Amino acid sequence: NPKGEAVYRLFVKAGSVMEKENQRGLAHFLEHMAFNGSYHFPTDGMVRFLESKGAKFGKDLNAHTSFNETVYKLQLPSSNPQMVDSTLTILADWAGGLSIDSMQVEKERGVILSEWLSKKDAKRDSDTAFLLELLNGSRYSERMTIGDTAVIRNCKREDIQDYYQTWYHPSLMAVAVVGDINSEQIKTLIKEKFGKLSSAASPTWKQCHIPVYKKEAVRILTNESLKTIELDMIQLLPLSKPVQTTKDYKAYLIRTLLNRLFKMRMNAWAFENPSYKKASIQYSSFLNATGVLLCSVELLPGKMEKGISEFIAQQ
């Protein structure tokens, strides 16, 4: 990080998969509400304050929601102790001091619906179809982060508040600060500001799993707007062990090396025998729920059959 700056993160181990049926999309809605009023920064006061300090929304100030987590992100000057104090106040407000005002909910409802419409195109449909195949009928497939537009249109502030009060619990949160900082000052401030959060009983959640495929299946998606022709082969495998020992680390290095070697081999073959554009094979853990072996090839028009045959022969 640049001198005089620090990166701040609030990690919340809660996302769309925790939503009830009538909450589909509210984890993401709540993320939006985090920038629309809190205990110390009413309405748009937080954004105005940060922008007055030179922060740019999207670059220095951002957040994302996924199936299993919501992450809030700041990158701000750290040389001024008062600014550091204010930044950690913002993180603490996100953790337990959001207003979720009814008027702000109505305003943000339109923003989220517009965001949903703007992302609805051929590429998005293709990506969603691929993801649904990967999720294989698990709970994840019923809890896409963007949610259900009917829920977004009709939810009340109380519905969002219910999700917030249930899942934004200290036991499901972590704070990280990295950069040009005084670590002792940061520790003291974190204890001071986050020590005031609710100590209610922690919510319980059973990890979701993605079942293995019961049989081989083929799904074909066509759309004239798509500019590429891709073949993806998915195999669900046991989840690899977390890296905790030298043996685990060795296994991780072997997997990484094999992924890279195969990619180099396939790209070299494509250069010498251009029947496809590029290809890759990669093993990774997915949502901490399953291991995935993904083989992908981008095919060339007019050479699809040859490209597929050569790709499979190389594996």
Describe these PLM feature segments.
Residues 1-11:
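Mature N-terminal segment immediately following signal peptide/propeptide cleavage
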Residues 3-5, 54, 65-69, 107, ...:
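Short, solvent-exposed loop/turn segments at the edges of secondary structure
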Residues 12-27, 32-125, 154-155, 159-172, ...:
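Active-site-adjacent, His/Asp/Glu-enriched structural segments that form or flank metal-binding
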Residues 56-60, 234, 259-298:
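A structural supersecondary motif
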Residues 72, 129-173, 183, 205-209, ...:
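Histidine-acidic residue clusters that define the catalytic metal-binding segment
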Residues 74, 95, 227-235, 241-260:
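Extended catalytic-interface subdomain
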Residues 111-130, 209-229, 268-277:
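Short acidic/His-enriched helical or mixed secondary-structure segments at domain edges of catalytic enzymes
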Residues 137, 174-232, 237:
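An aromatic/glycine/proline-enriched structural segment found at the starts
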